Amino acid sequence: MPVENGLIVLADVSGYTEFIATTELDHSREILGELLGTLCECAPGSLTIAQIEGDAVFWLSDQETPALVALLKDKFVEFHRRLRFMTLATTCPCRACASVGSLTLKFVVHRGSYVRQRVAGSDHFVGIDLVLAHRLLKNTVPSHEYILLTDAALASVTADGTVRHEETIEHIGTIPCAYIELSDMRCAALAERTEHLAPGDAQAATVRTFPASVERVRDAMRDEGAAGPRGAHYQLLEDPPTPVGGAAAGSRIPGGDPTHELTRDGARGSVLGQEIHCHHDGQIEVMRLIKSERDQHGSVATTHLIGAHRSVYLTQILSESPTGSRIEARLASEPVGDPASQLPPSFLAIVEEHLDRIAAAVAGAGEA
């Protein structure tokens, strides 16, 4: 096999050894699997997963990736957002589920040469630069949350806010490098709202009433065209509290617009943290479910809608009414409660259009 050259990136779950040593194996294994799956899901397109190594993910890239640091920071935030949803979703009192928040993430980035070998039907990689990258996981950086970059890696990526550092590796020598502290990035993951919008939180609200039962309204929302473009989040009001329509991450939404794709399952088997990506007008709008309750009398679901230059929370309440049922929609721009945050004027119009479609579908079902 020819010698290849590129970026070597390792993501390591910090604190996992202590976590697994002091908790129940079956649940700690499930938790690690979900976290590693989250890392793999949000891997930048220019990185290729070379191997899953216990509590670490190992990527390679032979492409120029100047924005790698920004991508890894996003990955760190996504990891901690997932941890938060896992904590919110679990009802298990075991030590593993109760202490999942103690885990965190660190990265090592190096650039060097390696050789790909095919062994027993699988690719394996060898080379002194791979050894170096893995040895750097055990280091003297005064943190558990960081990106450690060798000077070889720094020559090909953009990295601001670095702290100079060096490590001495036995049989290799002194390695000049730098690290970026990530602890402050936790705030971005914890800033996302996890509660429904109260009436006083809403910057805009609208209500539709239907001369039909809650179940009939749900049936109408299952109609392929009821919610229209960008309306996949309405399915979260009528679907049971399992992954949307029973779908798996990476699949299209059953019965929905073909531009809607379920990209991430909910945490710990719930719907919390579930993501739908809406591809519309060349843009991608992320719809992340942050809270949901449902029974035969109604539903409440709050979605975080993240698009180009906007971030909006939408709480939808489907409930019984004296004349049948009603849907109330509340909207607020992030950060909620900040007088400076402005709700894009088009959002209320889009929501009202969706509600009009649902009303038409309910009426059509009643005439059938």
Task: List each language-model region with its residue ranges.
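Catalytic beta-strand-to-alpha-helix segment of the class III nucleotidyl cyclase homology domain
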Residues: 64-171
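Hydrophobic ligand-binding cavity/cleft-lining segments
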Residues: 194-268
